[in-house]
Regions:
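Post-His helix in hydrolase/transferase enzymes
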Residues: 156-158
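A polyanion-binding, active-site-adjacent surface
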Residues: 2-119, 125-130, 143-154
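Short Gly/Thr/Asp-enriched flexible loops that form oxyanion-binding sites at enzyme active sites
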Residues: 130-136
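A short alpha->loop->secondary-structure connector
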Residues: 136-142
């Protein structure tokens, strides 16, 4: 069975299917671009088994790598870390960031206003690009762009 090329696959309009993870005590906001196909199936962030996010954040927080969604939520909120994405809806082929078009950005103001966000980090260049284009000026905050934990980022290993 041959893998289809992006040109052979069809665009799908995706609207972000689940809410941000944060609470009133969140101080750090980590932004992805848009949930992958696997994340949309699981209805939670960084659901692809080869995505390195949970291993990396666990190492940074000096915690065991969580396996369930509830463990992931508890770990992040205990460390005042919020998760959300820069894209609310777009047209995309599968999980390919390079195919993204017709972007509607996420309104990040509610998360920032209802929490104590002091630092914003973008998980990868795509997230950083859309944050800078649509959200940086509105929020009056800058973000640091980190290497993507996506399995598509073969140049980076953890």
């Amino acid at each position: 069975m041959n893998k289809k090329t992006l040109k052979e696959e069809k665009y799908e309009h995706i609207t972000h299917p689940f809410p941000p993870l944060y609470d009133a005590d969140s101080k750090i906001l980590i932004l992805g671009s848009l949930p992958s196909v696997k994340s949309r199936e699981q209805m939670f962030f960084y659901g692809h088994p080869q995505n390195r996010f949970w291993k990396v954040i666990s190492a940074v927080l000096q915690e065991e790598t969580p396996t369930t969604i509830e463990e992931k939520r508890k770990m992040l909120l205990a460390h005042h870390v919020a998760l959300w994405d820069t894209i609310y809806s777009c047209d995309i082929i599968g999980s390919s960031d390079s195919s993204i078009k017709n972007v509607v950005p996420t309104d990040l103001r509610t998360v920032v206003e209802q929490s104590k966000i002091q630092h914003i980090y973008c998980n990868g260049r795509t997230s950083g690009k859309y944050f800078e284009k649509y959200q940086q000026k509105t929020l009056g905050m800058t973000a640091e762009v980190l290497p993507s934990t996506s399995p598509a980022n073969a140049a980076w290993n953890f």
